[in-house]
């Protein structure tokens, strides 16, 4: 996979270019440069660790939107087996901005679904850049109700800039579709685990984000509006997105401190896209242990705990 570096990663990119140049020289001239390459690799690793240990909120937002960041299909391929995709909301369309279907986790049946932004231009357009319309949310709800009927736990992957704000989506009652999902997910009698893998934009994320365990990856974000949108409203200047991101508290560690999510999963050095297999392995271990624990909770108690979790958010003494 071709690496892409963000602006704040430029020192890392420069070192990587030097390492690649030395490898080419050594390969062409049969010169042993292994010691120098090893020294630069160690320096690059140290530099990467130093940069990523002190990222600003706006830089984390850029990481959450990284063009190579793993998407729902990447996690499905690595975490689950026997995935069988299910299409459509049975009313309007195939609803491709959310992908979902039945799969197995360690041999046990689960229902898995999540936003899919797409990777190449054609797929991005087909997936509507991961921005769900009413049909996507109704499709998601159909799959979750199917999971409830067949006693399968639900795993959702959240990565969207927000619900699609187009005229057609409004005509098909976008707000009702989101509200209905919030209402239904709070009552569905099966374990639900929600994982924020990239950006979680407002109601577009919440519509598949009500669960018994809410998990965020280290460099993911959760917000009611994008930093650019916030800056445009407050200061009439989208270039102040960095300042807005800092004030909004959108990062995983801030969200966790405010007790809005249950846990934050560390990412491989440099972000999840640097080692997708390792990131998926960490999530698989976590999902396995969390689902085992949730299955032991009586369903009536599970629903009550889920309800109380969300009712307690934002409460003040």
UniProtKB/Swiss-Prot annotation:
Cysteine pairings via disulfide bonds: none
Keyword set, alphabetical order: ATP-binding, Cytoplasm, Fatty acid biosynthesis, Fatty acid metabolism, Lipid biosynthesis, Lipid metabolism, Nucleotide-binding, Transferase
Main location: cytoplasm
Catalytic reaction(s) noted: N(6)-carboxybiotinyl-L-lysyl-[protein] + acetyl-CoA = N(6)-biotinyl-L-lysyl-[protein] + malonyl-CoA
Pfam assignment, any one: ACCA
EC number(s) given by UniProt: 2.1.3.15
Enzyme class: transferase
SUPFAM superfamilies: ClpP/crotonase (SSF52096)
Nucleotide-binding as UniProt keyword: yes
PANTHER family linked: ACETYL-COENZYME A CARBOXYLASE CARBOXYL TRANSFERASE SUBUNIT ALPHA, ACETYL-COENZYME A CARBOXYLASE CARBOXYL TRANSFERASE SUBUNIT ALPHA, CHLOROPLASTIC
Family listed: Belongs to the AccA family.
Assembly information from the UniProt record: Acetyl-CoA carboxylase is a heterohexamer composed of biotin carboxyl carrier protein (AccB), biotin carboxylase (AccC) and two subunits each of ACCase subunit alpha (AccA) and ACCase subunit beta (AccD).
Protein name per its UniProtKB record: Acetyl-coenzyme A carboxylase carboxyl transferase subunit alpha
Species the sequence originates in: Legionella pneumophila (strain Corby)
Name of the gene encoding the protein in the UniProt record: accA
């Amino acid at each position: 996979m071709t690496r892409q570096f963000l602006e704040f990663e430029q020192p890392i990119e420069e070192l990587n270019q030097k390492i690649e140049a030395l490898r080419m020289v050594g390969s062409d001239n049969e010169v042993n440069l292994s010691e120098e390459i090893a020294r630069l690799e160690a320096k690059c690793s140290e530099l990467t660790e130093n940069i990523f240990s002190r990222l600003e909120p706006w830089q984390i937002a850029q990481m959450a939107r990284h063009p190579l960041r793993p998407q729902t299909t990447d996690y499905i391929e690595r975490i689950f087996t026997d995935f069988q995709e299910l299409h459509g909301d049975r009313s309007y369309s195939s609803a491709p901005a959310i992908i979902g279907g039945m799969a197995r986790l360690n041999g046990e049946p689960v229902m898995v679904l999540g936003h899919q932004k797409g990777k190449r231009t054609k797929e991005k357009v087909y997936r509507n850049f991961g921005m769900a319309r009413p049909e996507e949310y109704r499709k998601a709800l159909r799959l979750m109700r199917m999971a409830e009927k067949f006693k399968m736990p639900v795993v959702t992957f959240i990565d969207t800039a927000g619900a699609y704000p187009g005229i057609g989506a409004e005509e098909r009652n976008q707000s009702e579709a989101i509200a209905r999902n919030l209402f239904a997910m709070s009552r569905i009698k099966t374990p639900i685990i929600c994982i924020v893998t990239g950006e979680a934009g407002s109601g577009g994320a919440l519509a598949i984000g009500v669960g018994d365990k809410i998990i965020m990856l280290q460099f993911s974000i959760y917000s009611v509006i994008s930093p650019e949108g916030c800056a445009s409203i407050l200061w009439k200047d989208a270039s102040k997105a960095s300042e807005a991101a800092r004030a909004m508290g959108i990062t995983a560690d801030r969200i966790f401190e405010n007790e809005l999510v249950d846990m934050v999963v560390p990412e491989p050095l440099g972000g999840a896209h640097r080692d997708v297999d390792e990131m998926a392995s960490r999530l698989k271990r976590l999902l396995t242990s969390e689902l085992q624990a949730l299955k032991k909770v009586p369903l009536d108690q599970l629903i009550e705990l889920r309800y109380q979790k969300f009712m307690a958010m934002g409460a003040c003494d």
